[in-house]
Amino acid sequence: MEKLERYSEKRKSRQQYFVYPLLFQEYIYAFAHDYALKGFEPVEIVGYNNKKFSSLLVKRLIIRMYQQNFWINSVNHPNQDRLLDHSNHFYSKFYSQILSEGFAIVLEIPFSLGELSCPGEKEIPKFQNLQSIHSIFPFLEEKFLHLHYLSHIEIPYPIHFEILVQLLEYRIQDVPSLHLLRFFLNYYSNWNSLITSMKSIFLLKKENKRLFRFLYNSYVSEYEFFLLFLRKQSSSLRLISSGTFLERIHFSMKMEHFGVMYPRFFQKTLWFFMDPLMHYVRYQGKAILASKGTLLLKKKWKSYLVNFSQYFLSFWTQPQRIRLNQLRNSCFDFLGYRSSVPINTFLVRNQMLENFFLIDTRMKKLDTTAPATPLIGSLSKAQFCTGLGHPISKPIWTDLSDWDILDRFGRICRNLFHYHSGSSKKQALYQLKYILRLSCARTLARKHKSTVRTFMQRLGSVFLEEFFTEEEQVFSLMFAKTTHFSFHGSHSERIWYFDIIRIDDLVNPLTLN
């Protein structure tokens, strides 16, 4: 424990000060508004409330914050809602959203500066063609084939909000900012409860996405901080090189023994490290830890993670959140794919002079497929089909024009095919295409008070073309002269794209809450 405390103190020495005054600068809220516009996804299936940015309202908010007893009254009388002006619903919503997003931007500054000034790290060249979530799968395909055990780790949601604030004290000593953070969190939780309710967490996640991502990623960062500490203590290998990336999502080059990567704290994070015997990869709240060691070593690691989370995070980590399996006998769900490492047997004929003999060869291969059941469940939750996968109409879109309805359905279908292009079996994707196509037809028929058959006959080939991905058309032309397969009917070809920087909402059901 003494080593752990010294390790924590070394990290604490890089704290930043005085970010609170930035809350009184108007340009901070302009940045928050610009982020909200860039973060809007046109394919999003859940409702999105367009909030108009008003510099006049921002100035009024800043003037009110300058008042001497403004924060005191807001904290002492939260029910009166003096900050959010509860008498006017528009002001209440606007002030809550813009102030929390601006506050999240301010809190991100010391974290970014801390990573930029982190001493002792070598500069690693950046590869723009590896800024993709799909880049992790070639890495898994190369490394996981030689490993033995796999641990599935489910990182729990943040615990009591007060512990979140205490964790931030390791990186920020700006007391007014920490008090203001407590003030925000007071709206989403009951401070008398020992454990934060899931309802409060999802409310914060829905209404204040940037602040939620910052808090959650800060929490996960502390979790992985101790994982890195344990790795240093348990291995005699010297960490030859390490690196920190501030890109949104960046994949590290292959280094000799060790690599660290995580993006800005407010984005969805992809983080991994590697050494000759152990590999760790995480995206959001799910992580996998694979190693070459024995079963006893993996059980010790599980015990370490449970005990350290109890000691430092003051949270009882349920042992069942860390599942241990042999890699060759298990499937794991990660980044929207169901992956496994099966052993395939090949019969090879070898001929020497006049004699020939057969060789039974075994090979491991990382097999990635699109899981049909979770994806159909996501479509059902988004009201495109029933729980059994039967297509239904989308009544909320009947007010749109016919072209907008076709465009939305077609874009969702193209995004699903684009993200799951690395699937070795495409049957599930064709099933999703059928559901979306028929749901689109029923939506149009409902709008025009007609039947599905009438609209299928009326639209014809134009309706079908909307549901072919651009990638299928492009690749079928590119490889027409050099290959003998067609991407329109292929069920086994896998393609990894280098332009996917976020996980699709349908692939990640948590974003639909």
UniProtKB/Swiss-Prot annotation:
Keyword DNA damage recorded: no
Locate the coiled-coil region(s) and give their ranges: none
A GO BP term here is: mRNA processing
Under Pfam families, the record lists: Intron_maturas2 (PF01348), MatK_N (PF01824)
* Record-linked InterPro entries: Domain_X (IPR024937), Maturase_MatK (IPR002866), Maturase_MatK_N (IPR024942)
Quote the subcellular location field of this record: Plastid, Chloroplast
Q: Does the keyword Chloroplast apply?
A: yes
Q: Where the protein is mainly located, per its record?
A: plastid
Instruction: Give the Gene Ontology MF terms in alphabetical order.
Output: RNA binding
Q: Which GO terms describe its cellular component?
A: chloroplast
In which domain of life is the source organism classified?
A: Eukaryota
- Which keywords does this Swiss-Prot/TrEMBL entry list? Chloroplast, mRNA processing, Plastid, RNA-binding, tRNA processing
Give the family per the record: Belongs to the intron maturase 2 family. MatK subfamily.
Known function: Usually encoded in the trnK tRNA gene intron. Probably assists in splicing its own and other chloroplast group II introns.
Which HAMAP family does this UniProt record tie to the protein?
MatK
**Annotated protein name in UniProt:** Maturase K
**Source species, please?**
Sporobolus indicus (Smut grass)
Q: What is the lineage of its organism?
A: Eukaryota, Viridiplantae, Streptophyta, Embryophyta, Tracheophyta
